[in-house]
């Protein structure tokens, strides 16, 4: 049965744009067929501990003498990686926090990006190559091409580098911009533009869920 891994990281539990959008994708995915299943991971409600040992960055065969991570931490990493490899499609809610990603999502990245296991190092193996991953990023301002603000987006580019370039996954990026226009009076003239960005994000996610779940 096709499986979706649905990951949220927003600290906002009741009015989150990224959560709403990943939920839309997951619902549309499920609508494709009763055989479609979803595994949901909430990194805010159930955060991973920060990586306990730098040795976990490497496959066991690449560790130097004396690098012996705690077996419990190693087992946790294995479970997180297995959850990712078992999925046919992945959707990740990655809201922009201080121009970067939530620390909970960074912790997850540190668990799954492992030289010699999920990332080529001494071999050319890329077990996640070609697996579709949809990055859903909400942001208070605009960082679109031509905005003059592109260089300040440290949310999407690192995820594309890790998941797409390093791990070989097939990355799609959907953004919903200007979410602060509803909150900050000085940004009120941008409300309509923000609403349009949200509508476009919803339309794109609906279509992606349909095509990836076909």
Curated annotation (Swiss-Prot):
It comes from the Bacteria. InterPro entries: Flavodoxin_fold (IPR003680), Flavoprotein-like_sf (IPR029039), FMN-dep_NADH:Q_OxRdtase_AzoR1 (IPR050104), NADH:quinone_OxRdtase_FMN_depd (IPR023048). FMN binds at residues 10, 16-18. It comes from Rhodococcus erythropolis (strain PR4 / NBRC 100887). This is FMN-dependent NADH:quinone oxidoreductase. It is an enzyme of class 1 (oxidoreductase). Its cofactor is FMN. Binds 1 FMN per subunit. The gene is azoR. GO terms for molecular function: electron transfer activity; FMN binding; oxidoreductase activity, acting on NAD(P)H as acceptor; oxidoreductase activity, acting on NAD(P)H, quinone or similar compound as acceptor. Its EC number is 1.6.5.-, 1.7.1.17. Keywords: Flavoprotein, FMN, NAD, Oxidoreductase. Homodimer. SUPFAM superfamilies: Flavoproteins. It catalyses: 2 a quinone + NADH + H(+) = 2 a 1,4-benzosemiquinone + NAD(+); N,N-dimethyl-1,4-phenylenediamine + anthranilate + 2 NAD(+) = 2-(4-dimethylaminophenyl)diazenylbenzoate + 2 NADH + 2 H(+). Gene3D superfamilies: 3.40.50.360. The keyword Kinase does not apply. Pfam families: Flavodoxin_2 (PF02525). Quinone reductase that provides resistance to thiol-specific stress caused by electrophilic quinones. Belongs to the azoreductase type 1 family.
């Amino acid at each position: 049965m096709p499986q979706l891994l649905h990951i949220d990281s927003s600290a906002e539990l009741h009015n989150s744009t990224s959560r709403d959008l990943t939920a839309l994708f997951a619902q549309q995915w499920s609508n494709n067929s009763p055989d479609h299943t979803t595994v949901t991971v909430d990194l805010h409600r159930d955060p991973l501990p920060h990586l306990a040992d730098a040795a976990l960055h490497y496959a066991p065969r690449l560790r130097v003498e004396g690098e012996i991570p705690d077996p419990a931490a190693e087992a946790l990493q294995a479970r997180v990686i297995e959850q990712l490899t078992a999925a046919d499609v992945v959707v990740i809610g990655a809201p922009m926090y201080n121009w970067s990603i939530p620390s909970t999502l960074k912790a997850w990245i540190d668990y799954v990006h492992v030289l010699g296991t999920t990332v080529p190092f001494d071999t050319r193996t890329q077990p996640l190559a070609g697996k579709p991953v949809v990055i859903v990023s909400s942001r208070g301002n605009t960082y679109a091409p031509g905005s003059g603000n592109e260089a300040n987006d440290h949310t999407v580019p690192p995820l594309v580098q890790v998941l797409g370039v390093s791990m070989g996954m097939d990355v799609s990026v959907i953004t919903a911009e200007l979410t602060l226009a509803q909150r900050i009076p000085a940004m009120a003239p941008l409300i309509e533009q923000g609403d349009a960005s949200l509508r476009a994000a919803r339309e794109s996610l609906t279509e992606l869920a349909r095509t990836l779940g076909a």
